[in-house]
Structure formats: C-alpha cells, structure tokens
Amino acid sequence: MSLEMFDKEIFDLTNKELERQCEGLEMIASENFTLPEVMEVMGSILTNKYAEGYPGKRYYGGCEFVDEIETLAIERCKKLFNCKFANVQPNSGSQANQGVYAALINPGDKILGMDLTHGGHLTHGAKVSSSGKMYESCFYGVELDGRIDYEKVREIAKKEKPKLIVCGASAYARVIDFAKFREIADEVGAYLFADIAHIAGLVVAGEHPSPFPHAHVVSSTTHKTLRGPRGGIIMTNDEQLAKKINSAIFPGIQGGPLMHVIAAKAVGFKFNLSDEWKVYAKQVRTNAQVLTNVLMDRKFKLVSDGTDNHLVLMSFLDREFSGKDADLALGNAGITANKNTVPGETRSPFITSGLRLGTPALTARGFKEKEMEIVSNYIADILDDINNEKLQENIKQELKKLASNFIIYERAMF
C-alpha cells in the first residue's frame, strides 16, 4: 500500500512542504538540500537494525553488514577531514557536542565559548542549554566591528582559566583563526574544541582553513554546508581522546546508532570527496560575495562589513524596523531567512536588530552570480519599503518564476 493510501494526511503535508521548498527561496544559512541518494538510503531497511556498540564490538548479532557500512562512513570521514579518528554515531550536532564535553571535562568544570547573542550556539555554554547547566560557562564575543578580538579572548581565558575552549559559531561571517585559539588554549592549559557545524562544507573544500592540526577535538553536523543527512560527527587525531569520545557517545549518551543515517552520512561523504564538491563550495562563497556587494551598494549595514564564508549578517540598528520585521517581510515574498541578534543589540532576542542570510541552499539549486544579483536586489527592494505588501506579493510571483528554472526535487519522497 502506498503512503498516499495509508496516511493521506502526512502524504499531503509532505507534498505541501515540497511545494514550499521548490517555489520559495531558502536563505536560512544553516539549511540546505541533501542528495536524493542520501534520502534513498535513509528510507532503506537499514532502519530496522539495532547495532549497539562499534564495528567488531556489537551487543547484537547480525551486524556484519552494518559493521561494513559504519566502517566505510568512518574511513570516508577521516579522509574528508584529514584526521586519524572519527565517530559517526552522534544523532545531531548538539549530541556530538554533549559527547565531547562528557569525554574531555567533568560536570562543574569551566568552559569558554562564544556568546550566543554574538553569534555562538546554545551548546557552547548558554545558560538555557544543558552545556550551561552541567558546566560553568564564561564567554567571549565580537567587537562592535563584528570581529573576534583574539587578544580579548586571551585576556578572558587567562582570567577565567577554563578547562575547555570552544571555537565555532552559528552567525559569524569571518574566518576563524584556529591557530590563535590553540595558542590561547595552550597558555591556560585548556582543551581546544572546534565546532565547525556551519562551515564544514567549506573547510573540506579548502574554502576555509581547517581546525586541524590546531584543535584537540572537532565536531560538526553532517547537513548544513555538507548537504548530508541530519546528524553529527566527532573527529580527533589523539587516540586516547578518541577512546574517551567513543565511550562518551556509547554507552554514555546514546544507545543504538541510527544505521540508516550512518549509511546516509557515508553517501554524503562520498559526494563531499568529489571534485564537484569543490566547485559547489567555491560557488557558495562567490554567491555570498555577490549578496554582500549588492546589499552594501544598496546602503545596508553588514556586521563586519562583509563575509568570508557562506553567510551574511545584516544589522538594522540604524533602521526603524527590526530583524523580526525583515524576516516577516521577506517571508511574505517567498524568501526564508531568520532574524538574528547583532553586536550592540538593543532589542530582545525574540525581536532582534539583525537578519542572517545564507547562500548554500540556493547554490545547491544551481543559482550563480546572475541569479544572486537578482535575488539580492529584490531583498534590498523589500527592505527599503518594508511595509509594502503589494511589492512583496509582486516579488513573490517573480521569484516563483525564477525558482521554477531551478527545481531541486521532482518528488517529495525517495
């Protein structure tokens, strides 16, 4: 029996989401379009298999083939990131980070991470997160120019003496200097943990410096800029840390791994290792630069005055409207983005004075400089006349026509 016959409600809603993804423009920096091949294996019979443990050391029988699959995923991950050890079992980036903390430090130990309101992530010590409840957290941020001041990070580290320093961000448009972070970590005797979830796809293509050999441990998601399935990974070059990480993930915080997702990670890594991937990642940055240039030419303020990666962070501190207003206006025109706090923030986190835009998903659809210039100017048009609902509707129809030339999926399920 087909899904349409068995559960028409879910079938119809899934197809409505397909329509939304195809007709609209996805510019949330952390979202992307994965491969049909990735979705195909995620919907396979591998979902039926329990495989607690690791290849060759399972608690269940019948794991000979999933052992081969997980080993393949591990080897591809190691090759991709040029590291010696990899754990591909984390179900998400947050669980990967949780596993790193459990492996490297003890509850109550101090961690130094990037302030959430400055571009960090919940799992980097935010008080509302378990990382801020189980561990004592302190923070560094960006200056009013939107950039990390590494000397200030050093001062904070010397004062706070953390056991672990987290470098990585969810809304930072500039290159992260992993070597400087390692210098600081060594000065205070801390582990350096790099969370590259948002830039991993650029890192493996050589479009952003690698955290290796500087970081003791590296984590990432496998979706976002990597375009794989939703999941997490942890990597290191230290054998003893690798053993601790493995124990922290299983049996520490997870039971049976999701073998259908691990297989999908392996498929994604194969794509990431191809020459085609390097072309894609380069275009992501090129498109982000086009977006930057148009918005700055149109007199919009960008945090750090530009970008080095896949995202642009707009600041509306000098405007009467908020990040929430901008988010809603673009949404009315079929452009999905997200409101974001900015340096010098004056509004609440639910309103904000900023907007985060990213180019990975549009690039995955085949958008290049010409299309990005069109889209960027439409964004500026909307924000220059933010209450003009007729303009928003007109642009929505124009963008729907543009999107129809770049259909990413012909069907909702694989």
UniProtKB/Swiss-Prot annotation:
It is an enzyme of class 2 (transferase). Pathway: One-carbon metabolism; tetrahydrofolate interconversion; Amino-acid biosynthesis; glycine biosynthesis; glycine from L-serine: step 1/1. GO terms for biological process: glycine biosynthetic process from serine; tetrahydrofolate interconversion. One of its GO terms (molecular function) is pyridoxal phosphate binding. It holds the Pfam family SHMT. One of its GO terms (cellular component) is cytosol. Its EC number is 2.1.2.1. It catalyses: (6R)-5,10-methylene-5,6,7,8-tetrahydrofolate + glycine + H2O = (6S)-5,6,7,8-tetrahydrofolate + L-serine. The keyword Electron transport does not apply. It comes from the Bacteria. It is found in: Cytoplasm. Catalyzes the reversible interconversion of serine and glycine with tetrahydrofolate (THF) serving as the one-carbon carrier. This reaction serves as the major source of one-carbon groups required for the biosynthesis of purines, thymidylate, methionine, and other important biomolecules. Also exhibits THF-independent aldolase activity toward beta-hydroxyamino acids, producing glycine and aldehydes, via a retro-aldol mechanism. Belongs to the SHMT family. Homodimer. This is Serine hydroxymethyltransferase. It comes from Campylobacter jejuni subsp. doylei (strain ATCC BAA-1458 / RM4099 / 269.97). The lineage of its organism: Bacteria, Pseudomonadati, Campylobacterota, Epsilonproteobacteria, Campylobacterales.
